[in-house]
């Protein structure tokens, strides 16, 4: 009886293995963005684009006025969720675009961190440099995203 159970268990394992290995075809990774995917990405793009506009409208003036307390507050306040939003969006892109988007997002964060340090040190020239570089990388990130037609 125990030999029969062992044999039955072995047969069930083999049948299960064959069924699992043959059951699902390989999923093909898309190479272009579908209109549905672009619409889905636009939900994530909008807050990031608003943050980019806010940088140009508000943060630039704070740096020009050398208002360092409000500069730091703006970086930690309205731009505080930017890291999460940009990395989340980068992860939603096609695999061919993900690495570049993640790299650009990290560069934007690096510039914002250095801008925050420059504001803390009240270093206007370094703050302006980091601000310009952050905008350039931010624009490169946004240009990498698919556009709704």
Curated annotation (Swiss-Prot):
Keywords: Lipoprotein, Membrane, Metal-binding, Palmitate, Photosynthesis, Photosystem II, Signal, Thylakoid. A lipid is attached at residue 22 (N-palmitoyl cysteine). The keyword Signal applies. Residues 1-21 form the signal peptide. Addition of an 8-His tag to the C-terminus of this protein allows purification of intact photosystem II (PSII) on a Ni(2+) affinity column. PSII purified this way has more PsbV and a higher Mn content (reflecting presence of the oxygen evolving complex) than PSII purified via His tagged-PsbB on Ni(2+) affinity columns, and has more O(2) evolving activity. It is found in: Cellular thylakoid membrane. When crystallized in the presence of Zn(2+) this protein dimerizes, but neither Zn-binding nor dimerization are thought to be physiologically relevant. PSII is composed of 1 copy each of membrane proteins PsbA, PsbB, PsbC, PsbD, PsbE, PsbF, PsbH, PsbI, PsbJ, PsbK, PsbL, PsbM, PsbT, PsbX, PsbY, PsbZ, Psb30/Ycf12, peripheral proteins PsbO, CyanoQ (PsbQ), PsbU, PsbV and a large number of cofactors. It forms dimeric complexes. Pull-down experiments with His-tagged PsbQ pull down dimeric, but not monomeric, PSII. This is CyanoQ. It comes from Synechocystis sp. (strain ATCC 27184 / PCC 6803 / Kazusa). The gene is psbQ.
